[in-house]
Each structure stands twice: as structure tokens, then as C-alpha cells.
């Protein structure tokens, strides 16, 4: 059969015509779909702008807070609960709603912005055990200014929430994370230490903060270490908290007794501590004892953690130690500390914070009962010291709480503090 006749036969065949038509339609649809995909990709690439913020970024928490303010109409929410136990023992909780994982749309500065909060269930943060998260902003146009404005606004909102408050950080894995909500700043004069102690520390630390060039010009490492020692309940930690508020610094809490703390992790944490922060190492005597005691009974004093004493010394002032850092250490037993730990260079200033003196008792009475005559405050101090000379500010404060509005009763029953 000639080729022309074969072609005519196929043309006249209805089954072939229908099949060819289906193939043509399918091919056209496939090409249209592929073209639409390529067109969408090209449109997103040239006419849309995207910003992805991973959960590890500092601005992630700011942006979630910002989204809570700007997505009040969203119906898909997640809850973040904060549990806080106050020093008085009272327990309070705070609930904050944030947009849940998924897509959300907000109207901002004349633009619709698509916000996608994604959660990767296959990827888990090994430090917290939570799924890996990120938030992605998508907007029409190519101007990045809208994202800068969002980040600036989120940052300002975070600063407003922290204004007048002290931010606490705790070590989680290899990074510092905020510990609860910022706490209201405690006035420095609310912690009454022995006369002159507060003034000496504040004067020294302000001189250190204000003169970085002096250290640099002389080749002296720009870091400062302080040790507060004395009986428990005398105000060491309270003073550091109040001092941080006075300096408008945050506090980084680090426990040396943490069994997961190693030499490398300690060195890394000290090197990445937030700027304008005080690093607080509480009860260092509980983490390390004098090497003389360890030599007497090595089994008894064998450490349970991975942190070594030499690792701590190197982190404080070794070759790899960081600068522009302020470290506070506290201890109830300075005699248990190795001399190498508290030598100059690692501890530049030591202050004893002990039991109440007559001056302290007088000042505390006048602070709790403003407007009362100085003679009444001195009478109270004399009666307390006649009963006992070993009384801490924490005990006195607890005693005043029993006589909130009764200074006469506080004086009359001052002898009960001996119990």
C-alpha cells in the first residue's frame, strides 16, 4: 500500500483520530501546567520577596511576639505557658497566644504579607527535644524595606517589654536562652550591705565599664572578676540582681554543678554570653574543692561532672578566654576554694557579705518603715544585737513581713529574732 493511502486510512479511522485528539489535549495540558509552574517560579523570583527566620535566630522570638500583635483575627493559635514561682512562694502562670504552624495573612504597611510558620517533625532540637521550626515571610514586590521595618518593629517591641526589667539567661546546650519573662528591676538601695561595700563595688565596676581603652592601651585583658563570700541569706545573689538592674545589664546564670557541663562547653558559653551581661557562677565551692582536700581523699571528692578545675581556670583567664566580660562568683565557704581560683586576674575584687551589723539593721528598719525617727531604728538594732549577733538580712526581712505596718511591734518583739 502506498504511503499516501496509509496516511489517508489513518486519517479516516475514527479511533485513531480520537486517540490523537486525547494525546494532543493531554500534551497541551501538560505544557500549560509546566508553563504555569515555570511562570510562577519566575514571578516569585522577580516579583516577590521572601524572608526565612530559623528558630535559632535571636529575632525568632521577637517576630512571634510581633505576629501576636498583628494577627489578632487568626483562628489557628498555639499557646505558650510561662510558670513562675516567686520568692514568697506564690505561683503564677501566664498564657500567650501565638499563630500556630501553618499559613497566615496579615496586612502591613499597605501590603498583604503571607506568613508561614513551619515545623519539621523529622528534625528535632537535641538540646530541648522540640521540633525544628522556622517562620517565612512572603510579600509582593522587590523592596526589602518592608522586612527591615518588620524586624525593627519587632525589636523595638521586645525592648519595650524589657524596659525597666532585668533579663535572665540560662545555658541550654551551647547557647544562652531567656529564662522566663524579664523581671522588674530591683532598686540597688533595696539590698542593704555593710556600709561602703555597695559603693566600692559600684565604683569599681563603673570604672571598668567606662574605660575599655585604658585596658587596651596597656595590653591588659579587658575583663573583671568579683567574688562575694559569706553566710547564706546575707544578700549576695540579691545584690547582684539589683546591681544588674542599676547597670541595665542582663544576668547569665551558669551552674558549675551541671553534669553536662564540660571544659569546651564552659569556654564556649563564656565567649558567646550576651553583651552587657553579668555572668553569675553561684556556690562555686559546691563545684570544686581545694586541691589539698582532694589530695587527702581523692575518692570522696571525685567530681561527678565533666568540668575540670583546670578547665574552669582556663575559661576565666586562659589564652582562649574572652574579653569585655564581667563574672561574679558567690560562695558560702571561701576557705574551701583553691587559691588558684581566687587569685588576681581571675578574681579582681573580693567582698565579704556577712551577718547584719548595727548600721545595716538601722538602715533596713528605716527602709521598711519610712518616716520613723532614727532613734527608733537604732533602738531596734540594739535590741536585735542584744538577742543575737548572728542574724542575716533574709531573717530580718522575714521578720519585718510579720509587722508590715507596726514598727512599734517590731521593736517590742525584736528579741524573738534569737530563735
Swiss-Prot record:
Q: Which residues lie on this side of the membrane: Mitochondrial intermembrane?
A: 1-15
Question: Which residues does UniProt assign to the signal peptide?
Answer: none
- What subcellular locations does the record give? Mitochondrion inner membrane
Can you list the GO cellular component terms from the UniProt entry? mitochondrial inner membrane
Residue numbers binding ATP? 230-237
- Top enzyme class of this protein? hydrolase
- What membrane topology term does the record carry? Single-pass membrane protein
* Role: Chaperone necessary for the incorporation of Rieske iron-sulfur protein UQCRFS1 into the mitochondrial respiratory chain complex III. Plays an important role in the maintenance of mitochondrial tubular networks, respiratory chain assembly and formation of the LETM1 complex.
Q: What is this protein called?
A: Mitochondrial chaperone BCS1
Amino acid at each position: 500500500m502506498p504511503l499516501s493511502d496509509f496516511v489517508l486510512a489513518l486519517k479516516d479511522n475514527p479511533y485513531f483520530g480520537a486517540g490523537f485528539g486525547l494525546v494532543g489535549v493531554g500534551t497541551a495540558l501538560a505544557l500549560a501546567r509546566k508553563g504555569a509552574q515555570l511562570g510562577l517560579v519566575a514571578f516569585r523570583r522577580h516579583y516577590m520577596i521572601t524572608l526565612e527566620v530559623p528558630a535559632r535566630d535571636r529575632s525568632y522570638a521577637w517576630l512571634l511576639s510581633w505576629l501576636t500583635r498583628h494577627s489578632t483575627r487568626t483562628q489557628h493559635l498555639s499557646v505558650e505557658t510561662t510558670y513562675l514561682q516567686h520568692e514568697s512562694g506564690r505561683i503564677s502562670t501566664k498564657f500567650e497566644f501565638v499563630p500556630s504552624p501553618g499559613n497566615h495573612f496579615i496586612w502591613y504597611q499597605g501590603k498583604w504579607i503571607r506568613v508561614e510558620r513551619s515545623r519539621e517533625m523529622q528534625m528535632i532540637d537535641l538540646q530541648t527535644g522540640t521540633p525544628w521550626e522556622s517562620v517565612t515571610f512572603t510579600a509582593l514586590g522587590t523592596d526589602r524595606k518592608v522586612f527591615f521595618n518588620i524586624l525593627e518593629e519587632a525589636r523595638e517591641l521586645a525592648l519595650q517589654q524589657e524596659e525597666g526589667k532585668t533579663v535572665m539567661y540560662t545555658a541550654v546546650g551551647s547557647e544562652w536562652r531567656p529564662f522566663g519573662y524579664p523581671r522588674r528591676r530591683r532598686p540597688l538601695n533595696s539590698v542593704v550591705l555593710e556600709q561602703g561595700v555597695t559603693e566600692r563595688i559600684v565604683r569599681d565596676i563603673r570604672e571598668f565599664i567606662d574605660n575599655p581603652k585604658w585596658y587596651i592601651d596597656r595590653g591588659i585583658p579587658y575583663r573583671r572578676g568579683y567574688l562575694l563570700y559569706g553566710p547564706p541569706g546575707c544578700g549576695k545573689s540579691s545584690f547582684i540582681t539589683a546591681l544588674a538592674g542599676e547597670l541595665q545589664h542582663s544576668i547569665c546564670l551558669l551552674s558549675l554543678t551541671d553534669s553536662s557541663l564540660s571544659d569546651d562547653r564552659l569556654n564556649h558559653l563564656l565567649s558567646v554570653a550576651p553583651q552587657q551581661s553579668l555572668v553569675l557562677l553561684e556556690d562555686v565551692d559546691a563545684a570544686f574543692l581545694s586541691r589539698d582536700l582532694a589530695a587527702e581523699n581523692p575518692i570522696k571528692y571525685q567530681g561527678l561532672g565533666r568540668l575540670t578545675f583546670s578547665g574552669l581556670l582556663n575559661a576565666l583567664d586562659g589564652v582562649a578566654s574572652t574579653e569585655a566580660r564581667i563574672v561574679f562568683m558567690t560562695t558560702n565557704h571561701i576557705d574551701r576554694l583553691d587559691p588558684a581560683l581566687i587569685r588576681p586576674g581571675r578574681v579582681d575584687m573580693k567582698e565579704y557579705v556577712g551577718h547584719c551589723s548595727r548600721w545595716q539593721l538601722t538602715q533596713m528598719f528605716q527602709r521598711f518603715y519610712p518616716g520613723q525617727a532614727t532613734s527608733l531604728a537604732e533602738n531596734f538594732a540594739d535590741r536585735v544585737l542584744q538577742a543575737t549577733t548572728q542574724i542575716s538580712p533574709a531573717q530580718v526581712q522575714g521578720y519585718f513581713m510579720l509587722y508590715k505596718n507596726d514598727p512599734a511591734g517590731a521593736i517590742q518583739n525584736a528579741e524573738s529574732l534569737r530563735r
